[in-house]
Amino acid sequence: MKLQLPRTKFCGFTRVGDIQAALELGVEAIGLNFYPKSKRYIEPKRARSMLDELAKVTGLHNAKPQFIGVFVDYSPEQVLEVLRSCPLDAIQLHGEESTQWVAAAEALPNWPGVPILRALPYRGQQDDALIQSWGALVASETSSVYGLLIDAYDPVHKGGTGKQVAWELLDPLPDCFRFDGGDVLGEAQVSVPFLLAGGLTPENVSRWMKIVRPTGVDVASGIESEPGIKDVEKMKRFIDAYRSCASD
């Protein structure tokens, strides 16, 4: 059975206290950015230290969060090297990786079978084939790809830009997001499990949740006072807004 896609993923943490605050709010997944050009970049050694420190914390509302490493154009071997020093629950591919990247990774003799979340843009029909090819991996029982993350397109920066997706393109959900879910979910036609990202804030998350109805949401800049520094009040307002919509 594949890992369940989180309903809430907060990304780009650089401080243990911020992660603890997010987990106390019940956030289901924490993103750690291993892209050296990102303002939220942390070295794998620092990430391991943070995870070790968090493991000592007790009494958190969310007992089993997913810790997801964000990688941009790493080779499978480079990702494997990070995984050896920094245990992660899943990895997020946020660069130009093709579906062949997954095949190459899964062919490595020491590949741990870590679940893969694929971040992709959606700008309309020009991205239909890309969504379909990765959606097919999500639908496959034998693939480690367990979901998609739909983010804003930026030819230079990879995530965390605050740019908004053209979310209106996802209402109604395009056919490329649908697949035969018989093998995985026991249903004839289902939508690809995906997280909505790109410019979400406490002020707009409820609106776009109601319109797009994704599996979950991902946010970085919308809960920060500056890149990598989370604002606890913004995190709380974001979670409150999400929950008010999710319970409707």
Which residues does each predicted region cover?
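C-terminal helical cap(s) of enzyme catalytic domains, especially alpha/beta-barrels
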Residues: 44-54, 103-107, 220-248
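Glycine-rich adenosine-cofactor-binding loop
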Residues: 10-12, 196-201
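Glycine-rich phosphate-binding active-site loops on the catalytic face of alpha/beta enzymes
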Residues: 27-39, 92-98, 153-157, 212-235
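N-terminal amphipathic alpha-helix/helix-capping segment at the start of soluble metabolic enzymes
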Residues: 1-10, 182
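Well-formed, non-transmembrane alpha-helical positions, independent of function
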Residues: 21-24, 81-85, 104, 207-211, ...
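N-terminal basic/disordered segments at the start of proteins
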Residues: 8-18
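Alpha-helix N-cap and loop-to-helix initiation/capping positions
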Residues: 14, 38-49, 161-165, 169, ...
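Conserved anion-binding
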Residues: 34-39, 51-196, 204
